[in-house]
């Protein structure tokens, strides 16, 4: 492929390193030229150098001095991204934010990404959001959703200090995403860190209460399965354990029909272990978002952009 957009990764920890391997394995319309961190002894930077990439511990300053870099994946921290967002915007670079900072609009690739290709900063919400919002949206587009709830269970070993410090932000941000992007009038999010050994795969339970009782169950199943295939295009380990289940249950709105879905996410194992599907879905989604932005920067009409 002759035309490619130069991109860089800011943050050389687990997320940044896994994303590096994904971009090298499947570059699409992107050319990864640099991985940047702040720790000169970082394993991620050492791996980047070994793969022939530019690697710097000078932080964002290194990227700001490189006008040819058009897209920057920020895999640092929310606090750092608040500062980075302003600097990257002033430098004319697009920021794809993998932190909870949310300086730009939330994006979920198969749901609303193409609405935001004119933005210079987009946010990937949370791992639970990337996993469950597509399913809520899939129900909502055929049966408007009154209430959506997700319970995300991840291996304790896959949750580093950043995840643990951001548990409250996770629940708030994911619930907001269920509403703003999923379409639910009210959203609720719960995360559980499971210490079991060997570590479990990421599992998510999603429950939706449609507004009207007379919805088409077959249409809901078809919509959810179609969305599953869309997400599998960039997260191959994303799979429903069964078709959606419909049950009459007591709710705060009286006895209602509840749509329940059980979802499992297995990582690709590019750098992070396969059980860390919660981290893998973030890096896979980031790669997808970067690819769509790269095609758009190269002049491809929005309706023709594919990833």
Curated annotation (Swiss-Prot):
It comes from the Bacteria. The keyword NAD applies. GO terms for molecular function: acetaldehyde dehydrogenase (acetylating) activity; NAD binding. Has a half-life of only 1.6 hours at 50 degrees Celsius. When TTHB247 is in complex with TTHB246, its half-life is increased by approximately 4 hours. Its EC number is 1.2.1.10, 1.2.1.87. NAD(+) binds at residues 12-15, 158-166, 278. The keyword Cell membrane does not apply. Gene3D superfamilies: Dihydrodipicolinate Reductase, domain 2, NAD(P)-binding Rossmann-like Domain. It catalyses: acetaldehyde + NAD(+) + CoA = acetyl-CoA + NADH + H(+); propanal + NAD(+) + CoA = propanoyl-CoA + NADH + H(+). Keywords: Aromatic hydrocarbons catabolism, NAD, Oxidoreductase, Plasmid. Pfam families: AcetDehyd-dimer, Semialdhyde_dh. Monomer. Can also form a heterotetramer composed of two aldolase (TTHB246) and two dehydrogenase (TTHB247) subunits. Upon complex formation, the aldolase shows a 5-fold increase in substrate affinity, while the dehydrogenase shows a 3-fold decrease; the kcat values of each enzyme are reduced by 2-fold when they are in a complex. Belongs to the acetaldehyde dehydrogenase family. Catalyzes the conversion of acetaldehyde or propanal to acetyl-CoA or propanoyl-CoA, respectively, using NAD(+) and coenzyme A. The aldehyde substrates can be directly channeled from the aldolase TTHB246 to the dehydrogenase TTHB247. Is the final enzyme in the meta-cleavage pathway for the degradation of aromatic compounds. This is Acetaldehyde dehydrogenase. It comes from Thermus thermophilus (strain ATCC 27634 / DSM 579 / HB8).
């Amino acid at each position: 492929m002759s035309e490619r957009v130069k991109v860089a990764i800011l943050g050389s920890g687990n997320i940044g390193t896994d994303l590096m391997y994904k971009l090298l394995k499947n570059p699409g319309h992107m050319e990864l030229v640099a991985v940047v961190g702040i720790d000169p002894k970082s394993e991620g930077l050492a791996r980047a150098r070994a793969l022939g990439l530019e690697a710097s511990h000078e932080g964002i300053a290194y990227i700001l001095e490189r006008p040819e870099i058009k897209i920057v994946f920020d895999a640092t921290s929310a606090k750092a991204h608040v500062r980075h967002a302003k600097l990257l915007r002033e430098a004319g670079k697009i920021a794809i934010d993998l932190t909870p900072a949310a300086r730009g609009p939330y994006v979920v690739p198969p749901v609303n990404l193409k609405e935001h290709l004119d933005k210079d900063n987009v946010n990937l919400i949370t791992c639970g959001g990337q996993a469950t919002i597509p399913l809520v949206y899939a129900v909502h587009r055929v049966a408007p959703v009154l209430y959506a709830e997700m319970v995300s269970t991840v291996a304790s070993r896959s949750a580093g200090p950043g995840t643990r410090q951001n548990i409250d932000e996770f629940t708030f941000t994911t619930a907001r995403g269920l509403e703003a992007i999923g379409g639910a009038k009210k959203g609720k999010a719960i995360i559980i860190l499971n210490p079991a050994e060997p570590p479990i795969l990421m599992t998510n339970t999603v429950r939706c209460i449609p507004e009207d009782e007379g919805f088409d169950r077959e249409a809901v199943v078809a919509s959810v399965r179609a969305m599953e295939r869309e997400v599998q295009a960039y997260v191959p380990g994303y799979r429903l354990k069964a078709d959606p289940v419909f049950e009459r249950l007591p709710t705060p709105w009286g006895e209602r029909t509840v749509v329940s879905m059980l979802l499992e996410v297995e990582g690709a194992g590019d750098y992070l272990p396969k059980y860390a599907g919660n981290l893998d879905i973030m890096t896979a989604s980031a790669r997808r978002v970067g690819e769509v932005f790269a095609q758009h920067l190269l002049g491809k009409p929005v309706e023709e952009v594919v990833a």
